[in-house]
């Protein structure tokens, strides 16, 4: 419901363009760094080329139909929700990693870089004014959400993100 009302497909497409442009700017900057060895530069460019952006909302929604909710049972609802989530997490054991899973809800005003998946994630709620407006000019959007995009890209190469390769493998 939140996404339907506050984040249309045109906003998702516009955000995709901004991310692609900033990734390209980072690629050019890394290519021009003279203090990096050629091998290090190549690894950085490879990693940057494998960044996966997630914009707005997940490709598929979690199914909560099996969760019993009773308006008159706050404590029971909490206990059932915790049990439901625990069962969902336990079901992941031995299963392939779901690369479509999000670790933040669309209505959260935040963004994150996930080094284990080499992905940058921008929930729909941060893609609203004053950070982002699909009807605003490029200068306003680069000044708003562009700073957030650059910040999240930067995490891929900071003291923690640099420990992972472009496939999300811990290498250092």
Q: What is each residue range found by the language model?
A:
Residues 3-152, 156-172:
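Intrinsically disordered, low-complexity linker/terminal regions across diverse proteins
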């Amino acid at each position: 419901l939140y996404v339907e009302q506050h984040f249309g497909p045109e906003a998702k497409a516009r955000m995709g363009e901004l991310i692609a442009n900033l990734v390209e700017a980072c690629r050019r900057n890394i290519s021009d760094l003279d203090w990096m060895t050629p091998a290090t530069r190549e690894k950085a460019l490879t990693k940057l080329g494998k960044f996966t952006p997630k914009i707005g909302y997940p490709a598929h929604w979690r199914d909560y139909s099996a969760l019993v909710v009773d308006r008159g049972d706050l404590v029971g609802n909490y206990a059932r929700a915790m049990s439901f989530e625990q069962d969902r997490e336990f079901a992941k054991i031995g299963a392939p990693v779901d690369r479509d899973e999000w670790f933040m809800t669309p209505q959260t005003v935040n963004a994150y870089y996930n080094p284990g998946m080499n992905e940058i994630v921008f929930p729909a709620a941060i893609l609203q004014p004053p950070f982002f407006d699909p009807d605003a000019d490029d200068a306003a959007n680069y000044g708003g959400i562009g700073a957030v995009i650059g910040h999240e890209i930067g995490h891929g190469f900071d003291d923690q993100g640099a420990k992972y390769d472009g496939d999300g493998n811990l290498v250092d």
